[in-house]
A protein has these predicted regions:
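Non-globular, low-confidence helical/coil segments that flank catalytic cores
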Residues: 151-154, 158-167, 184-186, 191, ...
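Hydrophobic alpha-helical transmembrane segments
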Residues: 7-13, 248-252, 314-320, 445-457
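Well-ordered beta-strand positions enriched in small/hydrophobic/aromatic, beta-favoring residues
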Residues: 125-127, 195, 246, 352, ...
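Hydrophobic alpha-helical segments of integral membrane proteins
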Residues: 212, 216-234, 242, 250, ...
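Membrane-embedded alpha-helical segments of integral membrane proteins
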Residues: 6-49, 363-366, 370, 465-515
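Hydrophobic alpha-helical transmembrane segments in multi-pass membrane proteins
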Residues: 14, 22, 55, 195, ...
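Helix-loop-helix transmembrane hairpins and adjacent membrane-interface loops
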Residues: 1-85, 325-329, 394, 398, ...
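Membrane-interface helix/helix-cap signal primarily in integral membrane proteins
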Residues: 2-6, 64-269, 584-591, 600, ...
Length: 780
């Protein structure tokens, strides 16, 4: 969307668009390579026949390019040669012994905050497979795997050869509405499977690879680690992780608190190495070269070498690769005083990026990077005309006008990228409009000082100290600005992700509006854009229109989260807990509710005081409005600190606390019967599980039974009452055989059995317990 978009001088723009369209078509409608080759041959014949008709010939060429994009995407997603590990990865996990080379730096993640005590750290890296053991001998294999070791492991580096024994499995797709698609994420990186190693004993280092590419990767990893050590030596513990993220792209050094602070202040992009950092580095090298009186050719060569080297250190992230290509094109044209069209340069960088990694078309980093640059290129010339600079102006006026120009350009970029940011991250940060104008100059100074620290701090400690002091102060100021910005009342708004169809409509109309040459058409597209915004807001605020009972059993790992939506739109959440990351589960629940266009939970009922049934409730109360928190009297009797804190803090979150016992009815919808069946008043079971709340839901002659972990004495008390058939049963205690014995099966006689969590053997054991033909659905 640059000024060049309005002229026919950007032929590569059409080429890049066609190539991207081909990738999109193949990702939506996969087709074999023969289809693309056959279509290309037919189009080639048509082009030859109509080569003297420019429009037909151009259309044929663009379609051939689109076929090339589809073919490139197909090749990147194909199973590969017969020895590819992708052919061995199936939906059923399998114990495997592999040998391969580590290609990414092993990173250790601590257990998530609030996780169970037995949770251990995990160490992750990507592995290039060389051999796999089949029966009694090893066979050659190719491909990449994501390795997850369920423990902390040290002494491994990029380029090391390792022998691994673990469980080979296929990455999962999105397990919940609006959830993260791990399979798609890994496939974009060329990873086709996951190897889970249970203990450190399943990992054995056997040497290191002498392959030139592996040795180069090892050298780059060592260079990044050496740079990180220099930063730690010259900066305070508070600012060193920020400097590592800013200068070396080591965002794993940031803790969750700092990461969330930068996200909520709308400044996270300043820490993620991107085109901004590449541009600042290029500007620094350019300035130094001019001060040294280098000629245009030498200056351009210095810029290109510096930028390309930095891109390699930054692991060729999409935004970095795009910026490196743009800077290289500009630098190569400078000695000849030739300036490439911005749209052409942007299209060329897109072609290079998609040719190397076609999956980056679906990457948020690549999408936001190209969109932001397009908005920058389109808005900058117009802002300069709107707020011109005058040579007669005073220094103060010049600074004010420069600041206003920067803010207006930032406003244009923010408005264009906000829908895409909301789609990927569920968040819009208006405070970034103000903060970025202050932060960019500080980040620029920090980057330049950081280059001095990294470049000379290892050889000349004195120079490192001289540059490290100001760098530490600037980064401390950046942290303070981000902290106060994130804590401001209107810093950020968490929002449901807009639909893909709405995004296509919005950006399609926006493209037509900025490229249209006719004023009337431009006005028409702008009106359409305004209508699209209004329709999007109304659709997001409109409640679900199906007017029926809707039950969603979310994947909570080993835990439970069941969302019930009544026909009148009111909602009930039964349980909110997991043995994994409770913060992640709380966000999963909110996202699932948002996907159903539900903005609040009218009631949250916690079955009992086991952490895998209530651990996410506290975070959930802070994420979305909750009307009532419902518990049984035995919940508080458990004496657990977390349970008591939850009930103490619930009023601060705006939720009322109510006790429920057997016989109570929840009045959410007059057409839905919701009755508590257990525990009765005064019941005191020997375990928390036996005290679990059991909820019966009736609607139009159908019955649903939500059971928590009911077993032992509590279950026997239920069995003493007359039983009636259940249409949908939530298997008690995550499908445990001890809670699903024959007496329980005969008492419930379910048509369907749902399992929240459970083990890999749960389904088979339940199929033996319940009558033949009973469908059993598991979240895991």
């Amino acid at each position: 969307m640059t000024s060049e978009l309005e002229t026919p001088r950007s032929p590569l723009l059409a080429v890049a668009t066609a190539f991207a369209a081909g990738i999109t078509c193949n990702s939506c409608l996969p087709a074999p390579a023969t289809v693309y080759l056959g279509i290309s041959i037919i189009l080639g014949v048509v082009w030859w026949r109509y080569r003297h008709h420019p429009q037909v010939a151009t259309g044929c060429l663009l379609l051939v390019i689109a076929c090339g994009g589809g073919l490139r995407h197909h090749v990147s997603r194909s199973l590969g040669p017969p020895g590819s590990i992708a052919r061995r990865v199936t939906s059923t996990r399998q114990l495997s012994q592999l040998n391969g080379v580590i290609v990414t730096v092993p990173r250790t993640r601590p257990p998530p905050h609030g996780a169970a005590v037995h949770q251990r750290p995990t160490t992750r890296w990507q592995l290039r497979i060389e051999t796999i053991r089949h029966r009694f001998h090893s066979e050659p294999a190719t491909g990449r795997l994501q390795v997850i070791v369920n423990d902390r492991i040290r002494g491994l580096d990029v380029g090391d050869r390792v022998s691994l024994t673990g469980w080979l499995e296929r990455p999962s797709t999105a397990r919940n509405p609006g959830g993260f698609d791990m399979r798609c994420f890994l496939v974009r990186q060329g990873v086709c499977g996951i190897l889970v190693v249970r203990t450190v004993g399943g990992v054995r280092r056997t040497g290191f690879s002498r392959h030139s590419v592996d040795r180069f990767r090892r050298w780059l990893a060592a260079l990044r680690e050496a740079g990180n050590r220099i930063l730690v030596r010259h900066l305070s513990p508070r600012t060193a992780p920020v400097a590592a993220a800013l200068l070396l792209g080591l965002r794993d050094e940031l803790d969750d608190g700092h990461r969330n602070m930068f996200i909520r202040s709308g400044t996270m992009h300043l820490l993620a190495i991107s085109g901004l950092h590449v541009g600042l580095l290029a500007g620094l090298v350019w300035t130094l070269a001019r001060l040294l009186r280098c000629g245009p050719a030498v200056t351009s060569a210095m810029v290109v070498i510096s930028v390309c080297s930095y891109a390699l250190v930054a692991e060729l992230r999409p935004s970095v690769l795009r910026a490196a290509v743009l800077v290289t094109i500009h630098a190569l044209g400078h000695p000849r005083r030739r300036r490439a069209a911005t749209a052409n340069s942007l299209a060329l960088s897109a072609l290079i990026l998609l040719g190397i990694r076609p999956g980056d078309l679906q990457s948020p980093g690549a999408q936001l990077s190209f969109l932001a640059v397009a908005a920058l290129a389109w808005s900058a010339p117009r802002v300069i005309k709107l707020v011109p600079l005058s040579e007669a102006s005073s220094t103060v006026k010049t600074i004010v006008r420069r600041t206003l120009q920067a803010w207006l350009v930032g406003l244009a970029i923010w408005c264009v990228t906000a829908p895409l940011v909301a789609s990927w991250f569920g968040l819009v940060a208006p405070v970034g409009l103000l903060v970025n104008v202050l932060m960019i100059p500080l980040v620029s100074l920090a980057l330049w000082l950081g280059v001095l620290v990294l470049g000379f701090g290892g050889w000349f400690p004195g120079l490192g100290v001289l540059a490290g002091g100001p760098l530490d102060g600037i980064l401390g100021l950046v942290l303070e600005i981000a902290r106060h910005s994130a804590a401001s009342p209107l810093a950020f708004v968490e929002t449901p992700a807009p639909s893909t169809s709405w995004l296509l409509l919005f950006y399609g109309l926006l493209t037509l509006a900025v490229t249209s040459q006719h004023r009337r058409l431009k006005s028409l597209w702008l009106v359409g854009l305004a209508l699209a915004l209004v329709i999007g807001l109304l659709t997001a605020l409109k409640p679900p229109g199906d007017r029926t009972l809707h039950l969603s059993v979310l994947d909570a790992g080993h835990g439970g989260a069941i969302l019930l939506e009544c026909p009148n739109g009111r909602t009930l959440l039964f349980d909110a807990g997991t043995l994994g990351d409770p913060g992640r589960l709380s966000r999963t629940i909110r996202t699932a509710a948002w996907q159903r266009r539900q903005r609040r939970l009218d009631a949250v009922l916690l079955s009992h005081a086991d952490r895998d049934h209530f651990s996410a409730a506290a975070d959930l109360l802070g994420l979305m409005p909750v009307g009532s928190l419902l518990i049984s009297p035995t919940f508080l009797a458990s004496g657990q600190r977390e349970a008591l804190e939850l009930c103490t803090d619930k009023t601060r979150m705006g939720a009322s606390l109510e006790l429920v016992i057997a016989g109570d009815r929840l009045l959410l919808d007059p057409n839905v019967s919701i009755v508590v069946r257990h525990p009765p008043a005064g019941f005191a079971g020997p375990t928390d599980n036996s005290c679990s709340v059991v909820l019966e839901i009736g609607y139009r002659g159908r019955r649903i039974l939500l059971t928590g972990d009911i077993e032992d004495v509590g279950q026997r008390q239920l069995l003493d009452r007359p039983g009636t058939p259940i249409d949908i049963l939530l298997a008690p205690h995550h499908g445990s055989p001890t809670a699903n014995r024959q007496g329980w099966v005969e008492w419930t006689r379910p048509e369907w059995v749902l399992v929240s969590g459970g083990r890999t053997t749960t389904r088979k054991k339940l199929q033996q317990a319940y009558r033949a033909g009973t469908p059993i659905l598991c979240t895991r």
